[in-house]
Structure formats: structure tokens, C-alpha cells
Amino acid sequence: MSQSFLSRLPLSRFELDRDHLGRERPALFDELWANPATRILLIFQGSALLATPDSLALLPVDAVPHFSERVYLGTSTSTTSPEPAGTPIVAVELDDAGHLAESDWANLRQVGSRLSDRDAGLLTEALGILNWHTSHRFSPRTGEPTVSEKGGWVRRDPVSGGEVFPRTDPAIIVGVTDADDRILLGSNALWESNRYSLLAGFVEPGESLESAVMREVHEESGLRVVDPVYLGSQPWPFPASLMVGFTARVEDGFTGAATPDGAEILDRGAQVADASGV
């Protein structure tokens, strides 16, 4: 896996120490709120407050309005950002945006590729963990409201004492090529017309990543593929996925045509004549 390939995965970039030991301090948020160096990343309805079109706004604690959730993201390791290395950063989810205009906010899909390594990592981490909080407010055992602890990285059931930890859903995305070096593309049933992508799908329980590649391609296109090769991974917090990239090739001697499944994939194309640069 080359660094040049990883540099093309904008959400895999980071310049942050997640400081897992700091999460264990019982008075962590009291300490952070008393520290004038602490900076806050505001999140509202899945979007972040921007300082410029290509940078996040990080505010001092006393500038933060009321919030519904907060998570300690860690300390910056960037030496090129306005805030010095070692700056502690907390993500805060707002109930409302107050006086801030809609144009002051942007979501990760809009700005992810434009952000610095530090800011891309911050926003990706913040969205992933805040999405987890949204979907785990109640205990799966007792139905009681859970309590956020350890810097926002654990939720505890106050009745049973059981702890719930963040989870990530692995999904594969695969570039399939044939003997003529054409690449397989598909159009999702939920997309607008003439929009295509590589085939992708979630990994099922008890399944390896490589097996998921072969199963998903066959289910969605009817093709049999072999030799899945791992390329790299990218977090995809929409809401909680890790996209794991592979290449694979159509099995030698396979003569069937690619056929969309009609449910998830409505169309397929192999119009990229030369896949070597993809």
C-alpha cells in the first residue's frame, strides 16, 4: 500500500493524538473547560462551523453556547495549524445554531477533500463518534437512558452497569477489472441517473473481507471474481462505516455478462477502457 494511494483518501488523513489515557480521568471535562488552551469544534445537524472555506473554526470554551453532547477528540499534533501542537480539542453537538448563518457551516462531503490533514481527521472523528451517541442513547439490555462517560467514548447503563462502546461497520469497495482491463461500475438504485461508482457493500457476520468482495460483486453484478487485493481504508462516518478498498479481477474463463441485481444496482457500465490509472 503506497503513501501516494493513501494521500488520495481524504478522510484517512489525521494529525491528532487521541489521548486514550486522558479519557480515563474522572474530572476530564472540568479540566478541559478550565484550560484556556482548549478549543471546541462545533457540530450542528452533521455540519461543522468553518473559519474559512477550507478550514474548521475552533473556538475557546467561553464562546460555546449550550450543547447536547460533547466528546474529547484528543490533542493536535499539527505543526502547521494556527493552534499549537498539544492543543486539546473537544467536539460539541449543538441543539440549535443560534445566530450563526447557514453559510457558516459545511458537511464532510462538501469540504473533506479541501481540509488540512488535521481538520479532516478532526471532523471525521467527531461525526463518527457523535453519530454513535445519537444511536445509543438507550441501553440495549434494559431500555434505560445511558450516560456518557470517559470523555464521551463510553456509554453506561445506570441500572445494569453495563458499558456500551463505539462500533464501526466494515464495508468493502472494489475495483473489478476484466481481461481487457475494463473496470466495472454500477449505478445505485437511490442515485440520480448517469451516476456510477465502484461496487461496494457491508461485510456480513462471520465473513472475511475477501469473501465479502467476492460475494458482493456476484450478488450485485452476477460476475465471479478472484484475487481480491487490499489497497487501503477510509473511515466513512455516514453514519459509522469503514470503507476497505480492494481490487479484484473477473475469474478466467467466466463468460457471463455483468447483470445488475435490479434491487441495489439498476445499471452497470464498463466504459472505462483503461483502468490502469484508476
Identify the meaning behind each predicted range.
Residues 1-115:
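N-terminal alpha-helical interaction blocks
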Residues 13-18, 23, 117, 132-134, ...:
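Generic structural "secondary-structure junction" signal
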Residues 42-44, 74, 90-93, 147, ...:
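Residues in well-ordered beta-strands of folded domains
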Residues 57-61, 145-147, 228-229:
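Short secondary-structure junctions
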Residues 64-114, 203-278:
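Unchanged
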Residues 97-141:
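A gly/proline- and charged-residue-enriched helix-loop-helix capping module
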Residues 125-175:
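Cys/His-rich short segments
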Residues 155-197, 202, 224-225, 229, ...:
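N-terminal strand-loop-strand
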